[in-house]
Each structure stands twice: as C-alpha cells, then as structure tokens.
Amino acid sequence: MTSNLIKFDDQNKVFHLHNKQISYLLSIEDGGTLSHLYFGGAVKNYNNQLKYPRLDRGFSGNLPESLDRTFSRDSLPKEYSSAGEMDFHTPATIVRNPDGSNALFLAYKSYKIEDGKPDLKGLPHSWTKEDDEAQTLIVTLEDKVSKLEYDLLYTIYRDRPVIVRSVQVHNHGEEAVYLEKVASMQMDYVDKDFEVITLPGAHANERRVQRENIGQGIKVFSSYRGTSSHQMNPFMALVDHDTNEFMGEAYGFALAYSGNHKFEVERDQFGQIHVNTGINDYNFKWKLNPNEEFQTPEVLMVYSDQGLNKMSQAFHSLIHERIMRSKFKDQIRPVLVNNWEATYFDFNEDKLKTIVDKAKKLGLEMFVLDDGWFGHRDDDNSSLGDWKVYKKKFPNGLGHFADYVHEQGLKFGLWFEPEMISYESNLYKEHPDYLMHVPGRKPCPSRNQYVLELGRKEVRDNIFEQMVKILDSKKIDYIKWDMNRSLSDIYESDLPADQQGEAYHRYVLGYYDLLNKLVTRYPDILFEGCSGGGGRFDVGQAYYTPQIWASDNTDAIERLKIQYGTSLVYPQSMMTSHVSVSPNEQNGRITPFNTRGAVAMWGDLGYELDLTKMSDEESDQVVKQVTEYKKIREVTQFGTLYRLKASASNQCAWMMVDSNKNEAVVTVVNVMAHAQPYCTKTKLAGLDPDKRYKNLETDEVFGGDELMHLGFYDPIERGDFKAKMYHFKAIN
C-alpha cells in the first residue's frame, strides 16, 4: 500500500483518516453502530478519549434486545442513520420494504482501504492522477433482514483539507426494495454552536450569502426544480459565530450534482448538530432490484481553521485540479463578445459582421452567436429541438459566417439549448412523445418551451446526432449550453408506474450522459454551462464545463454580491462575467464603464452589448480594458483569491495572487458616495512579507508586510459606483 493516510485501531475499533491538515475519526460502537468522533484540524494520534458518554435519557430508546439503557442511537453521533431504528433525527436513508415497512437497522459488517479514489459511473466525481495522492476507506453497513448493504466511501487526499464522501447501496436480497431517500453523507457534531451559511437567490439574483443561527428544530435548504437552481445552490457551511474571512472554523459542504438536492441541518434536543446532504427525496423513489446497486453523488467536505477564505481556497483548488477535466481548465480564457443583449433575435449575417469587425478593432478574441440562429427562430416561441441553421438569417450557411469570423482573427462560439423542445418545431411534429409530460395532462410552458425526456437514450441520441452535424464541421471553437426553465410535469414514458419516482434523477443522468459524449468527442471545443445564468452553477457541472455563465444579471453592482457568493465555493476561472450597456438592461442602473470592467474582470471577461453603438470614448475604454486584462488575466483567472471586504458593506474588495507571490491584482469598489465620507483602508493578503512590491501604475514600492498590515487609504471620489484596480509586482 503506497499511502498511509488511513489507520484502523483494531483494539478500540477506530478509523483515523489523517494528513498534515485534517483528521477524521469514526468508530464501531455497540450494536455495530458506526459512530462519528471528530472532523477538524490534524492530530497525530487518537487515544480513545472521545467515546460518547453513556446516559439514560428519557424517550431515547435502546438497541433491540438490549438491557443497557445508557446506549441509544437517538443521542449517539453517527456516520449514517436510517429510519425505523429508534433514532429520531432526520434519517440519511429511508427504504420501503416488500412488506410495506420502512424498517432498516444498519450495522457494521466490514471495511477495506484502497489507494487512490474510485470513479463513479455516470456521475461527476473527484479523481486522482496518481494512486498515492489519496486513499479511500469503504465501510460496509448491512441490514441482516433485508440483506441491503450500504458502502460508505471516504476519500482523503494527501495534501488537501478535504474529505470526499458518497454512498453505494447494494441489494443482496431476493426481492426488490424502494429507496425513498439516500443521502450522500451524514455528519453529527457535539458541543458546537454553529451558524449556517447558504447561497439562496433567484433568477438574475443568484448565490446571495445568507448567514443565520441554528435553533432547535430542522432547517432545510433545497431545490426540487430538477436542477441545482438559482434559488438554492448545493452548498452549505457551518461556522463559528466569530468566523470571518480570515479567522475561525468553517466546515464547507458542496454536492457534486446538478439536480434536485437537499441539505438538512438539525439541532436536536441535546444541542447537537445533525447534517444530511444529498439528492432531494422529494418525488424520489428508486426501485432497487436484487443484485442491483445505487450510487449517490459525491459531497466535498472542507475544513478550515483560518476562516472562509481558506475554506474557499480549498474548494477552488480541488474543483480546478481534481474535478474539472477539460484541457481548457489551465488555459487562458478568451475575451469574447456575445450578441444577445446587442441584438436579441433581431439579426442577420450582415448585422453580425459589423459587430465582428468592431470586435476585431477593439482587440477582442471571440464572437459568440447566441439564441436565434436555428430553425425559423425569430422569437422564443419556436424551433427548439431543430438544430439546423436558419437560412433566412444565414443564406450562405453557418459555416460561411464562421469562416468570416475566423478570417478576422477571432474564434467562433455558438449557443445551444439541447434539453428543450418547442411545440412549433419539426422535432415535435416527428416525435411528440419526446416532450416530457404526464399522459392525459397538458404540460406547463415556461419561456414558451418544454423539456425533453433526456432519461431516454433515443431522445439523447437524436439531439446528439443533430449537434454532431454542426460540430463536425470543426468551425466551432466554443459552445454555450443553456437551459432556460425548471422541470415540471415529471414523467418518463418508458418507465412503469412504480418507477416514476426515478424520473428526476434519470433526467440528470441522461443530461450528464449527453454532455459527456459531446465534451469527449470535441475536446478542442470550450464548453460553457448556463441555465438562464447561474441556475446550474455547481460542482457537478464543473466536471464537464470549466466555466459557467454566472448570472443573466450583468449589472456590475448587483454582480458584486452574486460573484462574492459564488466565490465561496467556485474558482474565479469558472465564473464568466460580462460588461454590458448602461443603463443596465436588467435594472436600469447607470454605472461607470470603468467599474463595469473592473467587476467583470473578477471572472472571465467578456462583453455583452452592441459594440457598433458605442461612443468613441467607450470604444477607447474597451481597448484600454482589454489591453490591461490581457496583462493580468493569468493572475485574475488562476491566482489565489482573497476576499478583503464583504459585498454586503458599502465597499467590496478582493484580490488574486499568483502561486509564487510575485504578482497581485487588487480591486476596490465603493458603492455609494457620501457628503462626509469615512476614510477607509484596504489591507492586502497572501503576499510574501519579505518581498517588495511595485505599484505598476504609480511606481511606488512597498513591503509585502506593509501592504498586509498597514494597507493603504482608499481613494475618495465624488459619485456612486466607483472602482479602483491595483496591479503589484515583486521586485528584486
């Protein structure tokens, strides 16, 4: 065995997962109960001092046939709980047995330790380059009556403060059972008075940081829209009351799944915190036949004892290095212009060429053709599912226009919405059964469109074959994959009635299958995810697309909060952000061009406006922004991110530092001006205290320790929404 990250103490029946940053401890207790002991900072050895106290607690029952009233699964912190075993916490799993009961008593059976990390078939997952960089513990729990086995998977990386968990359920019985809930993980904490941080939102208002106390009872943060959703991102953090960006403990949980999800946080009668995370059990019922298995999505669990920045940096590193697979993840992202807010559906080839010509003059690197190029689509009422060029707009064919874009020295990108269908489409005329609906009922439209049954292979194959005919031309450099509605009328026509509870999850598996086939076939195409902006911004999506459109809201000031929340989990290279017109299309706000550019440079910079209608002054500013961005984008896209000032305040500040601490880019945004402004300072982070750094704008030189401990005064300017960027480089 090449690794030594997991130990088992046979005498005390304790597993210890450990590296230089974290330890995770679990033990086998009475009745084969798998008990949780500890997750936190690294300890070299464990001497069995955390055996849970034995107390005779009223109304907390005991093990079957046991006379020991001091041991109860109702109070013991556990690794995985089921319904019907005298544990009254929210269960991690619920099973419907052939006799109609939900009885399940999971007890320890065996364990094994493997080098590396197993792949998850059909699901996004973290991975290893070499087996010796991680080790995986698989603990098997069994119910002896039903002959169900639950494999709990725990992977620890050698150099990361991360535990990756998932669950496999195996039916070794003689009859089918129904899984009504299967969480990917459970975590119990004793003597912790946490606050919980989540990322709720709405369309054009995604991932706003929400922080609240946990009182006795159950909090649920979830989506049952069929996607990870704008409304509740599949992430949660438990933090101490005094935890901030740089200090305090933080436990982060991110689910690698793009469908319905559920995070349950419960403070029980004894003040203990109980957490479940996984697929939402809303309308979920999976038939598990004999000799079949069910695999849950993964959960990434991060521990930080140095605040939220360190938690985020651990997520960023893991997602970038061991979730993303695209070759583009390490490549500089091109500065693009997207025609959507410039033209909407009102365009033809000649009109687009004028935008392409202007993009070339301004130094942009890619033109992205958005919605409206296919079928006979002049509005959002038709043609979804018909992925053939609209001859009225492109009489010479799409390839002819792509050639023109390439001749100007730009890359060419194209918008698709492969999961959707319009009533008014050839696809619907030929295959009306492809449209997801409940038989005998009219389906609900959203944005005048409907959802395809992606759980069916024949439906996926049809869309795949249509897209291949376009993409095999080798004239497409980039794809924006959109999804502009939530799922409804959930039904899969090739499933029997007792398996309709599988339709939501089978849709997600079908989506992953189709997307995986395309990204595998076209490794030289940069894929960007999108769902009306950030409606499917999650770890699972990152496995297939290295960048995602963060929000349909392009207002720079609202983007501060959206991007701040996004950065809690997701690396900035994953987040696309565009400069748009002022007054803004979404809220009418008038914002300086400089500020719009500075905020967009937090992510992958692009432009979403009609370049041909800009003034000479605005055009000059674009040239200036693009020129400067090309100098700093390796740092801004791939550097270590530090959030310096919270977006909820009147100022928001952040910075990125390269891995050698030789270069840093800092941005400070002052939201509202005041007649008598406070004098504020910005202190930097992540620099080398022994290096000297030059401000490339002013040629002033400061010590790294000066910039981090003393900082500098922020400029005081008249007017709202002012931004200032600083570029520092280390000097000899």
Swiss-Prot record:
Induction line: By raffinose.
Top class in the EC scheme: hydrolase
Catalytic center residues: D482 (nucleophile), D552 (proton donor)
Alphabetically ordered keywords of this record: Carbohydrate metabolism, Glycosidase, Hydrolase
InterPro entries xref list: Aldolase_TIM, Alpga-gal_N_sf, Alpha-glycosidase_related, Glyco_hydro_27/36_CS, Glyco_hydro_36, Glyco_hydro_36_C, Glyco_hydro_36_N, Glyco_hydro_b
GO BP terms: carbohydrate catabolic process; protein homotetramerization; response to raffinose
EC number(s) per entry: 3.2.1.22
Molecular function via GO: alpha-galactosidase activity
Sequence positions that bind substrate: D370, D371, W415, R447, K480, W481, D482, M483, N484, C530, S531, G532, G533, D552
Subunit architecture: Homotetramer.
Function: Hydrolyzes the short-chain alpha-galactosaccharide raffinose.
Family assignment from sequence similarity: Belongs to the glycosyl hydrolase 36 family.
Name assigned to this protein: Alpha-galactosidase Mel36A
Lineage: Bacteria, Bacillati, Bacillota, Bacilli, Lactobacillales
